[in-house]
C-alpha cells in the first residue's frame, strides 16, 4: 500500500531491497554477520520514510473510523497508517521506527521508539539488557509474533478489506481463511490473484487509493 507513497516494497522480485541482498539486511544471519551494515541500512530506510507522506488510500482507511470500528493489519513496516490517523494498527513484520534488544526482541522494556528528528541509531548502541539495539523488524525465518492477534481480529470482523497484497506471503496470506462465513470480503489490487482466493471475495482491480475511494463511497453511505 505504501508503494503509492514512494516507498519500495519489502522485497522485490529479484531478491533485493533498496539494492541490498535480502540475506544481508533482513535475516538473523545477516545481523550476526554485520550488525553495523544492518543498523545503517535501517537508518537509511528511516530517513527515507520520514520524508514520505500517507497517500489517499491510507487516509481513506483512517476515515472509516468515523463510522466503523477499524483494525488495520499491515505487512508494511512504515508508520504511514498511524500518521494518516488510524488508531489501531497491528504490524506483522515489525516497525521501522522502533528498535529493540537483539537478545530479547519482544521484551517491551527494551523497546525504543524513534522520532522523525531522531531516527538514526549509532552502530554499537546497547539496549537496556546490554545487547546491541537492533531494528524491531521480523527478519526472514523468524516467527511473526502478532499473527495470532491478527487472526483473532480477522475472525471477529464483519467486513474484511485486503489491499495491495499478492496473498502469497505466509503466514499473512492465510489470514483471509479466518474470516467469518458471512463476512463481506473485498480485495483491492490491480493484479490477478493466482490460487487460494475464496469464492466470496469482491475483487476491485485497482490500486490502493483508487480502490479505497470506490469502496469507501459504498461503505460510508
What does each model-found stretch correspond to?
Residues 1-221:
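Conserved catalytic core of sirtuin-type NAD+-dependent deacylases
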Amino acid at each position: 500500500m505504501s508503494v503509492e507513497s514512494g516507498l519500495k516494497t519489502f522485497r522485490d522480485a529479484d531478491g533485493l531491497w533498496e539494492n541490498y541482498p535480502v540475506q544481508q539486511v533482513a535475516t538473523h544471519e545477516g545481523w550476526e554477520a554485520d550488525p553495523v551494515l544492518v543498523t545503517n541500512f535501517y537508518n537509511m530506510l528511516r530517513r527515507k520514510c520520514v520524508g514520505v507522506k500517507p497517500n489517499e488510500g491510507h487516509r481513506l482507511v483512517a476515515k472509516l473510523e468515523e463510522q466503523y470500528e477499524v483494525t488495520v493489519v499491515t505487512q508494511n513496516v512504515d508508520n504511514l497508517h498511524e500518521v494518516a490517523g488510524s488508531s489501531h494498527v497491528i504490524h506483522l513484520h515489525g516497525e521501522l521506527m522502533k528498535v529493540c534488544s537483539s537478545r530479547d526482541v519482544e521484551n517491551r522494556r527494551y523497546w525504543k521508539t524513534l522520532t522523525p528528528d531522531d531516527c538514526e541509531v549509532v552502530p554499537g548502541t546497547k539496549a537496556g539488557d546490554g545487547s546491541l539495539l537492533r531494528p524491531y523488524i521480523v527478519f526472514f525465518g523468524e516467527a511473526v509474533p502478532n499473527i495470532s492477534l491478527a487472526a483473532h481480529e480477522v475472525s471477529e470482523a464483519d467486513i474484511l478489506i485486503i489491499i495491495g497484497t499478492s496473498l502469497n506471503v505466509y503466514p499473512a496470506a492465510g489470514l483471509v481463511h479466518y474470516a467469518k462465513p458471512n463476512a463481506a470480503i473485498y480485495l483491492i489490487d490491480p493484479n490477478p490473484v493466482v490460487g487460494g482466493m475464496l469464492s466470496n471475495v469482491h475483487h476491485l482491480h485497482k490500486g490502493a487509493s483508487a480502490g479505497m475511494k470506490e469502496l469507501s463511497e459504498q461503505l460510508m453511505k
